[in-house]
Amino acid sequence: MHEHLKEKLAILPDQPGCYLMKDKQGTVIYVGKAKVLKNRVRSYFTGSHDGKTLRLVGEIVDFEYIVTSSNLEALILELNLIKKHDPKYNIQLKDDKTYPFIKITAEKQPRLLITRNVKKDKGKYFGPYPNAQSAHETKKLLDRMYPLRKCSNMPDKVCLYYHMGQCLAPCVKEVTEEQNKEIVDEIIKFLNGGHKEVRSELETKMYEASEKLEFERAKELRDQIAHIDAIMEKQKMIMSDLVDRDVFGYAVDKGWMCVQVFFVRKGKLIERDVSMFPIYDEPEEGFLTFIGQFYENSSHFKPKEIVVPGSIDSELVERFLEVEATQPKRGKKKDLVELANKNAKIALEEKFYLIERDEERTIKAVENLGKQLGIETPYRIEAFDNSNIQGTNPVSAMIAFIDGKPAKKEYRKYKIKTVQGPDDYESMREVVRRRYTRALKEGLPLPDLIIIDGGKGHLAAASDVLENELGLYIPMAGLVKDDKHKTSHLIIGDPPEPVMLERNSQEFYLLQRVQDEVHRFAITFHRQLHGKSVIQSALDDIPGIGDKRKKVLLKHFGSLKKMKEASIEEFVEAGMPKNVAETIYTYLTDKKTL
């Protein structure tokens, strides 16, 4: 341990706060919080740890800490620091999925919709539905039962839904506000948990229709009841109070945490969410960080109640989220928490087995690759590849593999700026120069190994820039392909010597994955640029189309093919004035032009 670390550890306060662990480049690699900073921070440098924590501790050369006045303040500060620094050892929930809602529009003739976009309009929203299929099945049932209009625009004549009895045809008939209100109220009652009452009313109407010998009507009502039963069978009641609540459980094993969330809506367990991640804190602290990020994401709506295990500070959760948080001691809620805990434990055991098997393979491949090349274990590998077609739209791509796995947030794309024509060597020089000049300037992590997709010329060009211009001495290897453009072997050293790997070895498979991934990333980027240039060149001669409108059209349609199939109205919808839309349409439909 560094001497200055011992000195800082000796004067840590016994107060709550946050700590920031830093590596040799001064980059924040982990942010944590603690009720007692002195105890928590010292624990990293004493006692035994699992492999993942050992890796973290091995990179720590300095730390900072911030004292807070309370545990709540520490939790809030921790989440803000994680967002600011994005440390590589912290969990950073980036769940961008949005859940569907059922919406009753506020139009004069209202409609029933499925939407993932909740707006501050006068519409009524019901949800969210973590299970999208459940939302669609419920809407389908309501469409059959309640005849609100279905068409987005009013047609000139009645549609099929009218003939099926699922629409009152406001397009050709007068449907009063009172009629719509009656239907909307019934839908609201159903969605608010009143399906039993609705079912009972339908059953009464079915018997009345049968007694009046209205057998067709009775059959329709019977079918509606059957649809209700089918939907509700999938959403069996587990709580009688109809309160919306999220029930949390968790398990910890071998430095990993699994959190299970049960979504209970209107008394029914409708879906669950499973998250698994490495943990470097005490389990309770890790759980609090997770739950803070879970609801900070807009796709997770806070229910009326949050139920947490007994080991968690429910008062802190309640104050932070401003939602009722409970720790049940008995009853159905406690049973649900225990069920969530049990599921978390089982999921962790199953997943951990797969992770262990996968990590053993990938880490061993990385270690063996280092041995074969005569270098330190290349935990971080960065690979480069160029792509162009006869010199047009030349691009390059860089990917990163960390611990033998793709680290996609580290990928970078480059448009070649200084090279004219198809010159692969100069393109490689430019990209390596740009990448590592920026890495030095911004203090970005440097790789343990650089792989250049190419032969001796590519390797020489990249090495010259790295060593003679930037003064960096990072192991660099060329990835040579065979005549079928498949991975053959590596070359390394000065002069470059071939390193032959066993074709059935894990390290060879790792190189294949690196080659395939960097090639895929580069060629995809090139095709995107090439497609854009084709569209833009096709639009160059159209009067009234400048760069701004080209970008609008490209963003809206995505391809020249879709533009050629579009109508004048669709060009207007894309933001073009009517006269410009007509000009574009005429130009693109002229066979002599394209």
Curated annotation (Swiss-Prot):
Primary location class: cytoplasm
Domain UVR: residue ranges: 196-231
Leader sequence segment: none
SUPFAM superfamilies from the UniProt entry: C-terminal UvrC-binding domain of UvrB (SSF46600), GIY-YIG endonuclease (SSF82771), RuvA domain 2-like (SSF47781)
UniProt keyword list: Cytoplasm, DNA damage, DNA excision, DNA repair, Excision nuclease, SOS response
Alphabetical GO biological process terms: nucleotide-excision repair; SOS response
The GIY-YIG domain, residue ranges: 14-91
A Pfam family hit: GIY-YIG
One GO molecular-function entry: excinuclease ABC activity
Domain of life: Bacteria
GO cellular component, as recorded: cytoplasm; excinuclease repair complex
Subcellular location, record wording: Cytoplasm
UniProt-listed InterPro entries: GIY-YIG_endonuc, GIY-YIG_endonuc_sf, GIY-YIG_UvrC_Cho, RuvA_2-like, UVR_dom, UVR_dom_sf, UvrABC_protein_C, UvrC
Subunit structure: Interacts with UvrB in an incision complex.
Family, as annotated: Belongs to the UvrC family.
PANTHER family the UniProt entry points to: UVRABC SYSTEM PROTEIN C, UVRC/OXIDOREDUCTASE
UniProt function note: The UvrABC repair system catalyzes the recognition and processing of DNA lesions. UvrC both incises the 5' and 3' sides of the lesion. The N-terminal half is responsible for the 3' incision and the C-terminal half is responsible for the 5' incision.
Protein name in the entry: UvrABC system protein C
